[in-house]
A protein has these predicted regions:
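Alpha-helix-loop-beta-strand connector modules within alpha/beta enzyme cores
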Residues: 56-77, 110-122, 182-193, 276-278
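N-terminal amphipathic alpha-helix/helix-capping segment at the start of soluble metabolic enzymes
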Residues: 1-23, 28, 116, 278
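Active-site mouth loops of central-metabolism enzymes
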Residues: 16-33, 52, 71-79, 135-148, ...
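Hydrophobic faces of well-ordered beta-strands that scaffold small-molecule active sites
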Residues: 18-24, 49-51, 73-77, 95-97, ...
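N-terminal active-site wall of soluble small-molecule enzyme domains
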Residues: 37, 41, 50-90
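Glycine-rich, proline-tolerant flexible connector loops at the mouths of alpha/beta enzymes
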Residues: 25, 42-65, 96-104, 166-175
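Hydrophobic or amphipathic alpha-helical targeting/insertion segments
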Residues: 82-123
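Catalytic alpha/beta core domains of metabolic enzymes, predominantly
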Residues: 126-127, 135-281
Length: 344
């Protein structure tokens, strides 16, 4: 299904570019801390930021953050539709609501009318933990069909009010259910999809669940924006999201290839690979770098890398594609590799 383009400030959700987003986890009344985190997220490559607006005083965040960063800001609104109206009046770029907990139809209409007049898109955010009681009773659990029925009901309500600048998310903490729901949703509507696995957990498990739940959908051509949800620093969410896009060829940058090591490895490859990864994290080059333990893996198995290093007995060779260009001691190899990367 062809995606209906939806504009968000200077961005367009149309499938041509996948935007990485995150959400502030500072207290809503901590203006200085929230601004500092927003700046850190933008520096890390976050394309869209979201903040909770739980009460009227939190509205002060909007102007403070927008004055400090350039990327779009999304207000996360629950229960009180008046906060959505006030956020729009203060210049918010996008609003995330669950129409099911905003209140009466008239209140949803008020939000839709306000956003339409200002060109503000709305994300319908449906989660497995907040489905309507009648839908849960119908399906017995938050099945993919239940999630999609809820989302479609909210979509039709906004469309009824002549509003179609819509982005949709239908998140579950169950990875397989999440994937099935998004695949079904893509068949049912043309609106841009915001991908994510909700309540994914702490860093290690959350990263694995998100890589599977988000990455598999992106490989199917599904999804226009992603958020990796982690019980951790939001900057890590952004870096994880960017790495997922790199891994499936949806984002440029340095891609590191390294072997798991074995009994043939005679250098500290694990330490070396970590140093290379950390050093190249912010390098703006669209290249693949291989760090391999022995000549079996590199340059042989890593011949498709633009440049790489293969360990020997206390030494290492550096190669471009499948050609060796130099041999160095283990101590010199790291610096020599960086020097060759700089030439690319």
């Amino acid at each position: 299904m062809v995606v209906k383009p939806v504009k968000l400030k200077n961005l367009t959700f149309d499938g041509r570019h996948i935007y990485v987003q995150s959400m502030l986890n500072t207290r809503a009344d901590d203006i200085a801390g929230s601004v500092a985190q927003a700046v850190a997220l933008e520096k890390a490559g976050c394309g869209i930021k979201r903040c909770s607006i739980p009460n009227e005083s939190a509205l002060e965040l909007i102007q403070a953050i927008k004055a400090s960063v350039s990327v779009p800001l999304v207000a996360d609104i629950h229960f009180d539709y008046r906060l959505a109206l006030a956020a729009a009046e203060r210049g918010i770029d996008k609003i995330r609501i669950n129409p099911g907990n905003i209140g009466s139809v008239d209140r949803v209409k008020a939000v839709a009318d306000c956003c339409r007049k200002r060109g503000i898109p709305i994300r319908i955010g449906v989660n497995s933990g907040s489905l309507e009681k009648d839908i849960l009773a119908k399906y017995g659990s938050p099945t993919p069909e239940a999630l999609c029925e809820s989302a479609m009901g909210h979509i039709k309500l906004l469309e009824r009010f002549d509003f179609d600048d819509i982005v949709v998310s239908i998140k579950s903490s169950d990875v397989q259910r999440n994937i099935a729901a998004y695949r079904l949703m893509r068949e049912m509507c043309p609106y841009p999809l915001h991908l994510g696995v909700t309540e994914a957990g702490t860093y290690n498990m959350g990263l694995i669940k998100s890589a599977i739940g988000i990455g598999s959908l992106l490989c199917d051509g599904i999804g226009e924006t992603i958020r990796v949800s982690l019980t951790d620093d939001p900057v890590k969410e952004v870096k994880a999201g960017i790495d997922i896009l790199k891994a499936i060829g949806k984002r440029g940058g340095v891609r590191l290839v390294s072997c798991p090591t074995c009994g043939r490895t005679k250098i500290d490859l694990i330490g070396l690979a970590k140093r290379v990864e950390e050093t190249l994290a912010d390098v703006d080059k669209d290249i693949t770098v291989a760090v391999m333990g022995c000549i079996v893996n590199g340059p042989g198995e890593a011949k498709e890398a633009d440049i790489g290093l293969a360990g020997g007995d206390g030494c290492a060779v550096i190669f471009k594609k499948d050609k060796i260009i130099g041999k160095y001691s283990e101590e010199e190899a790291f610096t020599a590799l960086l020097a060759e990367i700089e030439k690319l």
